[in-house]
């Protein structure tokens, strides 16, 4: 893993960035696919209440998953930094300390999700017909939260080492098992939302076992010792990077939970339509998300090696790649959102509501190509406190108030509610540009 392919400090930026990003994107696509399979199979073989339960419950699971992913970004950045600085002997402490920290987090999440599943479902304002199914989905996923957390931490370790292909294999295993599980439990045994949750947990568990076996057998550029598995100074270092990102992501996801609650008040069909739209949104956001994760690894190595100009060039390269793909995704979502929605359900009313939301959301596919590339650049530069601050501003001062205002209007429009996301992203871009200019003030133009 220390070969030329994982050395981002030399060679073509475009080729190396795309080569590293593609497996990351592939893993995200498969991850979104097995999440979409839950909704697809329940939509086809379950009930409308089950569809609403899975869509609402998956919002809670997304909150947990995305926060853990951002917190583990600290591990990715720190490993990349130590590789760039030629100090691989420090990586063992990062991984061992990370295992301890995330084990504690898993225990806390288990207790909260299992014991408070129903209050969480009520807080989410799940439709009355779907409260029990939502609580069941959350409770079962909470029971297996250790595997969900472990997968994301292991993926962060491999990406930090410059290996984006192994996480792709992990999620491929999970995707296959989840599809088989959904078909067996939901389509075959008619277990509705509960079957989808069991399949999700089983898939993640198998993926974690596969990842651990691969990590143990792999020739690593460092030594992992028993004494590494304790609280150590590396824990504070990766938390300094990851914690601000996790806080920002937590509030962002809470804003989406609040948005889900706003829309749930509009009825069962609107709730189900929003759930379908969210699955399409997850796919639409894959390229920006892959860029952000890849950019953090790419930039952290170059910053560690003192190649700051190359780090800046990689950000602009990422923006260019993101915008080219983003234009295609925008046209597909805006013009053919109804066709995409019909993949998940045959209910015409649900399809119509999903498409209404997508029409307002569509510009987000362009804005995030810029925003996420810049965020990845700042993450790699250890400017995660700023990333958190801009996230809080656009979430608490723009997205949530605007979405709430739109949701309480007479004959509330899902299209207008959907527009809250791209408007808040535009604010985030302005803040990022300001921070970038401030960081590089006084530098001579080349």
Give the location of each predicted region:
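Short alpha-helical transmembrane segments in multi-pass integral membrane proteins
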Residues: 1-21, 79-146, 188-243, 299-364, ...
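N-terminal transmembrane alpha-helices
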Residues: 8-40, 44-45, 59-74, 78, ...
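Interfacial/gating helices of multi-pass transporter permease domains
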Residues: 19, 42-62, 129-133, 193-194, ...
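Transmembrane helical elements of multi-pass membrane transporters/channels
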Residues: 19-38, 140, 174, 203-207, ...
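Helix-terminus/linker motif at the lipid-water interface of multi-pass membrane proteins
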Residues: 29, 33-52, 121-128, 184-191, ...
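Alpha-helical transmembrane segments and their lipid-water interface positions
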Residues: 31, 35-42, 65-72, 76, ...
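Small-residue-rich hydrophobic transmembrane alpha-helices
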Residues: 51-111, 148-167, 273-337, 368-390
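Short runs within selected transmembrane alpha-helices of multi-pass transporters and secretion channels
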Residues: 72, 141-159, 167-175, 196-209, ...
